[in-house]
Amino acid sequence: MSPVVETADPHPLSWLDAVAERRRAAGLRRELRPRAPSADVIDLAGNDYLGLGRDERVVDGAVEAARTWGAGSTGSRLVTGTTQLHSTLERELAAFCGAESALVFSSGYAANLGVLTALSGPGALIVSDAANHASLVDACRLSRARTVVVPHNDVAAVDAALAARTEERALVVTDSVNSVDGDLAPLRELHAVSRARGAVLVVDEAHGLGVAGPGGRGVLAAEGLAGADDVVATVTLSKALGSQGGAVLGPAAVTAHLVDAARTFIFDTALNPPAVGAALAALRVLMDEPALPAEVLRVAAELARTAGVAAPPSAVVSVVLGSPVLAYEAAQRCLDAGVRVGCFRPPSVPEGTSRLRLTARADLTGAELDRVRDVLRRKVRP
């Protein structure tokens, strides 16, 4: 064996310092800010649209599940991780959304990775919207399918990509509600094109469930597409339902295939019982209080009016400020005044479109909404 010779080469991770400095200079450094459990701050940065994350009924659902099943699942869904609670949530979630079947994953991210990789692969085509969430982008990359990225909500471009395909199988993939701008995908038109071209439409309803459609059943339900035999949906349990986890909904043949083929289902520890219990309790609250989604949209319209932007068809209000420094400073001013808002900078959004993202909540009191409006008027564009 040759002797080890020490060199004057830099440390193999020294490049991280230069990258961090470039990010700092561009106003793109991110940091973790632990929050106190009862800070006197109104949160418009998270995704707890229905205000169920701290609802006593939802918390009780988590506590009861922990007492009955324990704090963790102890294994994957195929080993020890599937409890009767998981099955109940899947059954009730599918029924609520109008799907034949549902399969719960440990996160919405894992659900997207699992469904796209399992339904595509080499020899398949994925047509993906340019504004899709990072989890869908990563799923396309990992799928080994040929991926064509089309302009946001461009149905003609989707049709052209499908018409030119040589692959036997094809998927069209989109968010139902864009997570940054809050606009809706033209699902009815996308479904018509997909069906005509023999493709499956895969829709991420992360920001649709609990907010859009009849009683919060999602954009697919609003467009009359819930339960269609050539549509697959994914949802998250961590936004409107105030818990954690994700699920795939669609034909029973699809979820059965995922049990055999979705690596993020097979090899991942199952969603923990407290999260399942909380999600199930939140779903039942939503079923018992079908007016909650309309209240979210009312609050979103109020926030948009105050911020000087158009009212969105969802809970997401986007206020574009341009530079990352302007967005960061505005978010900090709002926080200092007692209102936490989202600050989106590249790479989360394109260059020159850094923005504040405000997320509406159904549980805001009149006094809280008045306070928010006052802060937005004074602090967003001082």
Model-flagged regions — what are they?
Residues 294-338, 348, 352-353, 360-362:
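Conserved PLP-binding catalytic core of the aspartate aminotransferase-like
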Residues 5-71, 199:
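N-terminal "arm"/small-domain region of PLP-dependent enzymes with the aminotransferase-like
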Residues 59-60, 65-107, 300:
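Conserved N-terminal alpha-helix of the aminotransferase class I/II PLP-enzyme fold
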Residues 2, 52, 56, 60, ...:
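PLP-dependent enzyme catalytic core of the Aspartate aminotransferase-like
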